[in-house]
């Protein structure tokens, strides 16, 4: 399994080092530094093989985490461990930085001792780890036998992600549906490719060991598994979404999801990601960009861009930014926009148009005259696509939360006693229109 774990700063200095197998030596540390961190060309692959040794690495800010092995391991499992390790460190001391790692190096070694056992990942659930590993170290001397038995049952039991005895004065549940819509559109308005990547993030402040049930859009259609079809959902008369693939938090009972298409679970305490999904059909495109580029001789371009919002008039889009690329030999730009502010940025070779807010079913436009320097280059301007950033208060996939129910029979509180909040946020991913 994992032979060793090393954490480096941007200079290649080792901040944390833990070796689990005898076949990993000091030369592995230097090999990664020379071939990856100090490489002449940027290393794009997350897996690097050097002298029959595999280095699985991720980067957070200026910090490198590298898992090293000489065995044929499951790559997905190693990366899942590395990302989990990043999440655990973030939960304990916030931002992953060189200063924070140096200030908490004892804590990190304690966490590694619990998370990895002889190179095999064991327990990476933050809630369980926080019961006996704190910022001050392992709480062992002042614990009663009862507290120690609770920790043991949580770590080794079926519900390792939640401890017993949690109590809140007010029971609250926050649900965020966060989506990123990606688009590539032709100049004529034809959709060349589009997909939505979504996450359902939950913040749970519930007493006891509550049972939660979560439902969306009548039914989820998982096409690849073939367990639901569009015809099946059409009988209900309600719109449903077709999800291409999805993954769930370990607390979700997958057997019930397969048989009943209901998401039931006992949630961890605090914030966690309930599910992640991807869809490519029936996407609501929040904006359409209509470009018009006209060449006036060899030293002038006229550009006109219209953006149209395609959602309900009662909703407001925010943080709108349109980037219109310009040729490398641009000497000057004159811009006129109906709404917002526009500025030519020579360092980025682009006109950046910003609008604070825009209601649904509206349109706005920008016109620009671009002066060009004479050039001997016979190659035509490639016309890079116009890109757009925005944030809208709905899910572009069409996903809607139908119900969110909570049951806690032991503490005698019901679904009506829980305060629930649901929020939808749609953001642009790579949202481009060719011109």
Swiss-Prot record:
Keyword set, alphabetical order: Cell membrane, Coated pit, Endocytosis, Lipid-binding, Membrane, Protein transport, Transport
GO MF: lipid binding
CDD domains recorded: AP-2_Mu2_Cterm (cd09251), AP2_Mu_N (cd14836)
Annotated GO biological process: endocytosis; intracellular protein transport
Major localization listed first in the record, in broad terms: membrane
PROSITE patterns per the UniProt record, alphabetical: CLAT_ADAPTOR_M_1, CLAT_ADAPTOR_M_2, MHD
Domain MHD residues, every copy: 170-434
Signal peptide: none
Phosphoprotein recorded as keyword: no
Binding site for a 1,2-diacyl-sn-glycero-3-phospho-(1D-myo-inositol-3,4,5-trisphosphate): 341, 345, 354
Entry's localization field: Cell membrane; Membrane, Coated pit
Function: Component of the adaptor complexes which link clathrin to receptors in coated vesicles. Clathrin-associated protein complexes are believed to interact with the cytoplasmic tails of membrane proteins, leading to their selection and concentration. AP50 is a subunit of the plasma membrane adaptor. The complex binds polyphosphoinositide-containing lipids.
Quaternary structure and partners: Adaptor protein complex 2 (AP-2) is a heterotetramer composed of two large adaptins (alpha-type subunit and beta-type subunit), a medium adaptin (mu-type subunit) and a small adaptin (sigma-type subunit).
Family: Belongs to the adaptor complexes medium subunit family.
Stated name of the protein: AP-2 complex subunit mu
Taxonomic lineage from the root: Eukaryota, Metazoa, Chordata, Craniata, Vertebrata
Name of the gene encoding the protein in the UniProt record: ap2m1
